[in-house]
Amino acid sequence: MLQPKRTKFRKQMTGHNRGLAQRGSKVSFGEFALKSVSRGRLTARQIEAARRALTRHVKRGGKIWIRVFPDKPVTKKPLEVRMGKGKGSVEYWVAQIQPGKVLYEIEGVSEELAREAFALAAAKLPLATSFVKRTVM
């Protein structure tokens, strides 16, 4: 599972997930990409599940890039614990996603195969996504 090796602080505030993705909104590495259309959070487990779906479908062909990383800790208190007594411990890690963020990229496969693979990966994600091609200027 993806998570930072070390962080400056163990816990973070919840914060707000506003605006559109400025960075990471262009297809940089591969030929085709899966881009988010809605906003939300992706857990490390969801990112990994979609990655597995992609790699299984393309088999040995093609190269895959994961363009998101879960760097925000989410805390949770244990079951049946009363409120108060401080913040809970870190339960899992999430990546905050804004509309327009490229999630996965792929190269070395046909467009038809890439579309099928991204459709399988998108089914594992809690966001609305779209298929995009690299534009050459």
Swiss-Prot record:
Keywords tagged on the record: Ribonucleoprotein, Ribosomal protein, RNA-binding, rRNA-binding, tRNA-binding
InterPro entries the UniProt entry points to: Ribosomal_uL16, Ribosomal_uL16_bact-type, Ribosomal_uL16_CS, Ribosomal_uL16_dom, Ribosomal_uL16_sf
Record's keyword annotation contains tRNA-binding: yes
GO cellular component, one term: cytosolic large ribosomal subunit
Family matches, as SUPFAM superfamilies: Ribosomal protein L16p/L10e
Gene Ontology annotations of biological process type: translation
GO MF entries: rRNA binding; structural constituent of ribosome; tRNA binding
UniProt keyword Ribosomal protein present: yes
Stored PROSITE patterns: RIBOSOMAL_L16_1, RIBOSOMAL_L16_2
Function description: Binds 23S rRNA and is also seen to make contacts with the A and possibly P site tRNAs.
Record text on subunit structure and interactions: Part of the 50S ribosomal subunit.
Family as reported in the entry's similarity comment: Belongs to the universal ribosomal protein uL16 family.
Name the UniProt record assigns to this protein: Large ribosomal subunit protein uL16
Species this protein is from: Stutzerimonas stutzeri (strain A1501) (Pseudomonas stutzeri)
Taxonomic classification: Bacteria, Pseudomonadati, Pseudomonadota, Gammaproteobacteria, Pseudomonadales
Gene assigned in the entry: rplP
